[in-house]
Amino acid sequence: MFEGFAVQTADGLIFTVKGLVHPPDRLVAYLRYLPDPQGDREREGVRYRRVYRFEEQQEILQMRYPAYLSHDPVFGIQVQSVPRRLIRTVYDPCCHLATLRRRGPADLVEEHALRLVDLLQETADVPLKNLGISGSVLVGMHRPDSDVDLVVYGEAAGRAVHRALRRLLDAPSGPLRRPNREELAALHAMHRPDTPLSFAEFARLQARKVNEGRFQGRSCFIRFVKWPAEVGERYGDRRFEPLGSATIRARVTDDRDAIFTPCRYAVEDVTFLETAPFLRPGGLCVTLGAQTVTFPDGSPVADLREVVSFRGRFGEQVRVGEWAIARGSLERVVPRNGPAYHRLVVGGRAGDYLLEERA
């Protein structure tokens, strides 16, 4: 199980699985739905509520379901995670697509999801086995106005579908289009509590992307995920030490993995614009504008190589050759074999952002 999957627990909670690397006894996953008599979703006679904000997810789990929070020794932080012994149902995006194709759609949302899959599969000429249905449709929690969320697995298939989406969206007329100004304003309002960008900045960034659009009058989002075997990383191959939050300016040198979730941007010529310590006794000693940040024990934060995000919305934000401004969590990465380096993780906290520097 990895990015795009969902699981239901013994407590009736539904989590969405995040990332490709997981501890042997737990799945890193975010709370998405919980039983609630006042909820606006219903499935099999049980009402549920969707939990949107990360802070609310954390509060619910801390107060009511602490078994789903754990401090991970490899990731170095407390993570939302599901003990494998508490998993009762696994929702596989590819299997669910196969089920829908076999039995046919039960409503208009499922019909639109199947039509979009057919459009992308035909236009990109990729195997159907690489496509899946995720989001609310995957777990049977969709409403008549729900979005369609798809996932494309595999690097080659992902790049092919990405190219196909650009052709479809750039066509003067067709079944798939970009959001108009009113629709962009609604998306901006939804994301604004977590990412403090102006509407103009948000609209400019969205215009770069092809993974979000409108199909049959409905919002759609396509996520690109490499197969775990293509990444080749096992739990414990790298250890991560959180150092604090930071804002940096850096030149993007590689954006080949910008379309995927998780996404990655290689960077050079890094300058720290702002820092704030956490989890590190004594905090940071830093001269703003310096390229090296030094801790009280004398160890430097040098060799910051990459900006990464586990959130789909930070994909395709900046491009090779551009200067990026990013705010996120600074981490020291310690491989099992090889020298340590640093990275900035964007999207783990409210207020994180990633955008190109404007003159």
Model-predicted segments: where are they?
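Catalytic core of pol beta-like nucleotidyltransferases
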Residues: 1-132, 137-145, 153-359
